[in-house]
Curated annotation (Swiss-Prot):
Primary localisation category: other
Protein name from the UniProt record: Biogenesis of lysosome-related organelles complex 1 subunit SNN1
Subunit structure: Component of the biogenesis of lysosome-related organelles complex-1 (BLOC-1).
Gene it is expressed from: SNN1
Source organism of the structure: Vanderwaltozyma polyspora (strain ATCC 22028 / DSM 70294 / BCRC 21397 / CBS 2163 / NBRC 10782 / NRRL Y-8283 / UCD 57-17)
GO cellular component, one term: endosome
Amino acid sequence: MDSESANSVHPVELCVYSTLSSDLDSIYQAISELRRSQAMLLFTIRKIRDSIKEENDSLYEIQDLEIPIQRLNDLTKRANNLQRKYDLLKEKTSRLAKKEDEE
C-alpha cells in the first residue's frame, strides 16, 4: 500500500492543484489582456504626441517668423528715423520762434 499511496495523488492535493492552476490561468489571462491594453495605449499616446508635435512645428516654424521679424525691425528703424527728424524739426522751430521774438 505504501507504493500505491506514494504513486497516487491525494484528493486534497488534486483540489489544491486544480484551484491554483485555474487561478493562475485567470491571472495569466488578465496579465495578457493588460499587456495588450498597455500596447494599445502606448500606440495611441505616440500617435497623439506625434500629431501635437507636427502641429506645434507647423505653428512655430522659425522660417515663418523671419519675414514678420524683419518687417518689424524695418518699421522700428523707420520710426526711429522719423523720431529723430521730428526732434530736429522741433528744435529748428523753437530756434526760429526765439529769433522772431528777439526781432
